[in-house]
Design a protein with these regions (language model features):
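Conserved N-terminal structural module of periplasmic/extracytoplasmic solute-binding proteins
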Residues: 2-110, 175, 304, 328, ...
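Hinge/lid segment of periplasmic solute-binding proteins
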Residues: 27, 108-159, 211, 296-298
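A structural signal for short loop-to-beta-strand junctions that line the ligand-binding cleft
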Residues: 92, 100-102, 130-167, 197, ...
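Extracytoplasmic/periplasmic solute-binding protein
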Residues: 148-154, 159, 183-228, 271
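Conserved C-terminal helix/tail region of periplasmic/extracytoplasmic solute-binding proteins
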Residues: 169, 384-444
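Glycine-centered hinge/linker elements that transmit conformational signals in sensory
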Residues: 186, 226-255
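Extracytoplasmic/periplasmic substrate-binding proteins
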Residues: 241-328
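Long, aromatic- and glycine/proline-rich binding clefts that accommodate carbohydrate-like moieties
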Residues: 298, 348-403, 439-444
């Protein structure tokens, strides 16, 4: 099983942003009554108060439904956000030994650093590891390793090509199945209408990592305290050979991603496609409503026409060791991500689930979306999830890595220059940072 945590779990502690590799987990909480499925049931019946840090759109509705099902439990929901600031705040409360939530939502990229710092409860104690077969391989391996389970997957992000059929038809562009065809389409479209771009990318570390993943790159390898970084491996160079064509020829829309103008251009067709994840459709429908009926979904282009994909985003719910209600917290996590009602509320909010039964269900696969011209777009996402390649690892300081991407590789985007030069700068900065945090970081 692929896992970003597999070999790294020989380390007992790890740096988070700005915190060196040292004992930083802080005092642990009690087990909340011992660990097994029975203790979860007993804890839910007895009740108590939980604090939950989350940002998912479904969180409020899920908490309300959970409290209705278990009236003796009071869940205090806090939208603490995500990203470096939120994770630094969480780590600081863990280190201080007080103030941490009982349950937190973590992006897949952040799970390793909290697992390695011994900050998370191993949910195998409550029998939740028995749920493995109910989740996709990629999402489960993001939270499980070496017989330990650090959370339950919630949403996932298998990647696809989302495109504006009206614009494609207007310019006689066939849906590209290879990256060479995608670059050719970008040139054709922009030459025909200089105000229109095939796609948008300002330089995002997570997005770039996902594209490298799909290309077969494995630039990050973790083995205990040893971290190997090779941002010039074969797969990474495959990606830059394609993306340099778009960057150096100024074929990427310069509009800032997720800005009002960006959504407006997606709605009008000035940005005619996006390589993105299964969570994109809900964003388009709400923020780029003018594109209704024009958009479609297709498999992600590949290098040789053979299906291949990657995950872009995804998150899980974890129980923080500081919690004094660990059994109750584990029960809440199980309800959120493994109960029919909890998962349905997630789906209703526009997120793509991690549970195979829900992904493969006729209700999901047969759902026709008017925004996408009546297409059953979940069929595309489901096939993408099945073609996610294994073997990918995130750095144990991945959150930090993404924060410095704009200052390194991002400069190549900004100046329309060779991405490989930016990747080398990124690698140098990561090696320096990792060694400062107590890892042995080497390059190939």
């Amino acid at each position: 099983m692929r896992s970003s945590l597999r070999t790294a779990l020989a380390v007992t502690v790890v740096a988070t942003v700005g915190i060196a590799l040292s004992g930083c987990a802080g005092p642990g909480g009690s087990t909340g009554g011992g660990g097994d499925a029975t203790s979860i049931e007993d804890a839910l019946e007895e009740g108590g108060t939980l604090t939950y840090w989350a940002w998912a759109p479904s969180s409020e509705a899920q908490v309300a439904a959970f409290e209705k099902a278990y009236p003796n439990v009071d869940v205090k929901l806090v939208n603490a956000g995500s990203g470096v600031d939120a994770y630094t705040k969480l780590q600081n409360t863990i280190k201080a030994g007080k103030g941490a939530p009982d349950v937190a939502q973590l992006e897949d990229t952040a799970v390793p650093q909290f697992a390695l710092s011994d900050s998370l409860v191993d949910l195998t104690a409550y029998g939740l590891d028995e749920l493995e077969d109910q989740y996709t391989v990629g999402t489960w391996s993001a939270v499980a390793s070496d017989g330990k389970l650090f959370g339950l997957p919630q949403d996932s992000g298998p990647m696809s090509l989302y495109y504006n059929k009206r614009v494609f038809d207007q310019h006689g562009i066939a849906v590209p199945t290879t990256w060479d065809e995608y670059v050719a389409a970008a040139k054709t479209l922009h030459e025909a209408d200089p105000s229109t771009y095939l796609t948008s990318d300002n330089g995002d570390g997570l997005f770039a990592s996902s594209l490298i993943w799909q290309a077969g790159g494995r630039p990050f390898q973790v083995d205990g305290t040893k971290v190997t970084i090779d941002l010039q491996d074969e797969g990474t160079l495959k990606w830059t050979s394609v993306w340099n064509e778009l960057v150096e020829n100024e074929l990427l829309a310069p509009t800032a991603a997720y800005s009002d103008d960006w959504y407006k251009q997606l709605g009008s067709g000035q940005i005619a496609s996006l390589i993105s994840a299964a969570w994109l459709p809900s964003l388009l429908q709400t923020a780029a409503a003018d594109g209704a009926g024009d958009w479609r979904a297709a498999p992600m282009p590949t290098y040789d026409g053979t299906p291949a994909s990657a995950n872009y985003g995804g998150s899980a719910q974890v129980v923080i060791k500081q919690s004094e209600q660990q059994a109750l917290a584990a029960g809440f996590v199980e309800w959120l991500n493994n109960s029919p009602e909890g998962i349905q509320l997630l789906i209703d909010s526009g997120s793509f689930p991690s549970t195979t039964a829900d992904i493969d269900s006729p209700a999901s696969l047969d759902l026709a979306t008017e925004y996408f011209g009546g297409q059953k777009i979940n069929e595309v996402a489901q096939a993408s999830g099945e073609s996610v390649s294994e073997g990918w690892q995130y750095l144990p300081f991945q959150v930090y890595a993404q924060t410095i991407f704009p200052d390194t590789v991002g400069q190549s985007y900004a100046n329309n220059t060779d991405l490989n030069e930016g990747l080398k700068d990124w690698q140098d900065a990561l090696v320096k940072y990792g060694n400062e945090q107590g890892f042995e970081v080497v390059t190939k």
